[in-house]
């Protein structure tokens, strides 16, 4: 038989192991190497690291690390998902405290029960919606068990949730509040809890973020203590007055400030400024202007400003002093309409809207204007003031002669102009200056047949520009043939010293030829005035511009003797910048009338005797000084 595979004995045959025994030749007294331990036995430990397995271990470690990292990430994602799903099931701290009291109560006290603890089911105000899978009842029972378990653990002190809440920072608390459905209501509630006054009692709300105001009331939440201390100094360069209060709570420092800035700002600008100075989000701020006419709000700022809880910088706003300082309460007076009428008369303010707006702006310095704002019938007061002012101005104008009126208009213009621009323009239009002065002299005096001047010419020759500049200086009236269908289109002539009809066309000349011949003559005419009987008056001097020379047109022969015609043949000149070469402004007309005063024969007998004003200053109030606030 053949030999079996393998070997029969150890080390037998040609393929066996060779046993080699080392022979150490050592004699007594030879030195033994420090690396050798003669007494130790050969255990084979020196052969442990004979084979290098580092690469195997490193690969295994990397695989285990990646698996652990993936497991940690998955666990974190699952925890967040569970937290989102069970957020509404977390019990509030107040319920935990009440449960602790119930669990720690003594058996005797617990046996005493006033309420009837019925075990029957009650109707729920907020029922859980059915998921559609029929597991709503099971989920509700599990939720109750979880809440009871959390309550028990929080009462026994063995759960870590309570310790985590104690370690929460103020910033984390305020962020949790802002994540709620109504963060503004939470901040308003915290403000009232700390300061004992509602924030809405101190402010008047602005709906728009673009509305500007100089005074602003701000409540800031979640401010750190160091920032609150430094903010007192950082805010001063931006404001004229600041009133700062700060109280600490679980949210951090809650600051209340009343600030008057150096210029008017809107809410967006203030949010950006305070976000940079306080290092908090704009969602942590309540920014509104203060109540300016609330005595209670003014007293709050006044009293807290004197206490040690406030830091005040700058001069106290006048609206606080007006409602708190005793002297200002003595100066409060009743409204006097005559003072308002006198103010409107002196400032030539006769439009109702302008009277209301400008007089309200004087409330900070005029006690009568302040009383006007406190009145409940401001609209009626404004209407009465405008009506009386127009009556006084109308009567004053009627008593003045044309020379007195031109002198009063010259006194209204403060600048000094150049009369030569008007003369150069007339020469440019080929009009003799002497003939124009003669016609203007008779025109201003209202001499019959010379009471109307017609400026005729081609388009773009400066007819309307010349006439409008003269009417603007003399504060005349403008009538338009477009309103001729109305019975009252000539009514402005009743209160004017001079009138103008611009761009008369063929239908307009037909109307003048049929109905206004007496008006062109300068004779008394009857004019229909709204809400009054027919008014008889002498028609004021009338200046007409037209492209039609009605003074020579055969269609209107009866107007030839009633019109003084001047023709403008040349186009109006402009410089390379588009500005008029000849400036026809109020100051140049003032210089023109001052220069030609004697040539126009505007002097009167009483003016020669007395160079002063013939009319004294009008007064509708008794002489007294206006008391300022």
Curated annotation (Swiss-Prot):
A molecular function (GO) term: ATP binding
Reactions catalysed, as given in the entry: Couples ATP hydrolysis with the unwinding of duplex DNA by translocating in the 3'-5' direction; ATP + H2O = ADP + phosphate + H(+)
Top-level lineage group: Viruses
EC number: 5.6.2.4
GO (cellular component) term, any one: host cell nucleus
Modifications the protein undergoes after translation, according to the UniProt entry: Phosphorylated.
Enzyme class: isomerase
Motif (Nuclear export signal): 105-114
Cellular localization per UniProt: Host nucleus
Domain (SF3 helicase) ranges: 431-581
Residues binding ATP, per UniProt: 457-464
Chain location of the short sequence motif Nuclear localization signal per the record: 86-88
Region (DNA-binding region): 166-332
Modified residues (Phosphoserine): 92, 106
InterPro entries with a match to the protein in the record: Helicase_SF3_DNA-vir, P-loop_NTPase, PPV_DNA_helicase_E1_C, PPV_DNA_helicase_E1_N, PPV_E1_DBD, PPV_E1_DBD_sf, Rep_E1_papillomaV, Znf_lg_T-Ag_D1_dom_sf
GO biological process: one example: DNA replication
Cross-link Glycyl lysine isopeptide (Lys-Gly) (interchain with G-Cter in SUMO): where in chain: 538
Keyword terms: ATP-binding, DNA replication, DNA-binding, Early protein, Helicase, Host nucleus, Hydrolase, Isomerase, Isopeptide bond, Nucleotide-binding, Phosphoprotein, Ubl conjugation
Family per record: Belongs to the papillomaviridae E1 protein family.
Subunit structure, as described in the record: Can form hexamers. Interacts with E2 protein; this interaction increases E1 DNA binding specificity. Interacts with host DNA polymerase subunit POLA2. Interacts with host single stranded DNA-binding protein RPA1. Interacts with host TOP1; this interaction stimulates the enzymatic activity of TOP1.
Function: ATP-dependent DNA 3'-5' helicase required for initiation of viral DNA replication. It forms a complex with the viral E2 protein. The E1-E2 complex binds to the replication origin which contains binding sites for both proteins. During the initial step, a dimer of E1 interacts with a dimer of protein E2 leading to a complex that binds the viral origin of replication with high specificity. Then, a second dimer of E1 displaces the E2 dimer in an ATP-dependent manner to form the E1 tetramer.
Xref: HAMAP family: PPV_E1 (MF_04000)
The protein's name: Replication protein E1
